[in-house]
Amino acid sequence: QVGQRLILTKALGTGTLFAADMRLKAKGRWVQSALQNMIQSNREAARCLFEHDTSACTDVTGFGLLGHLVEMTKASAVNVELEIENLPYLDGVIETLAERIFSSLYPQNRHFQTGISNNASLMKHPLYPLLFDPQTAGGLLASVPNDKAQDCLKALHALGYEDACIIGRVISESSQISPITILS
């Protein structure tokens, strides 16, 4: 719904980190951090989001953040702004993305870039590839009323979802082919 905030409950980057691990280019602490992130259940986060009147929610998995956001925006017929600098990411992700180490699912997830209205201006941003990174046991992406977003975030942090953050907002109703504007 227009005016709502987009909350992501877990950090991104499992795809690139495990691709790096398979190439023996990931540090042990990076993999350990990713595993800790993955074993955290989404159950309490889902309950918290529900208690804060979320109107739409999905898990972020193999299609990556952008793939799931495109599906959410199209199903809800809304446009959103996504703040790329606010994306939470796991230790080692900046390094693996800089080395252009991607999951085998990454190339097919790139087709979701058609959902970005200002795609051309962002392709060189260091976090751009993270938008397409497939997640294993990823977090939840939810749309929460603006007046409840900060309380929801505090509650998520108290429940142990330390990386939970607001990554964007719903700006208008629409049925555009490219419903997502990325802010950097």
Residue ranges and their predicted role:
Residues 1-184:
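Helix-biased detector of long, well-ordered alpha-helical tracts
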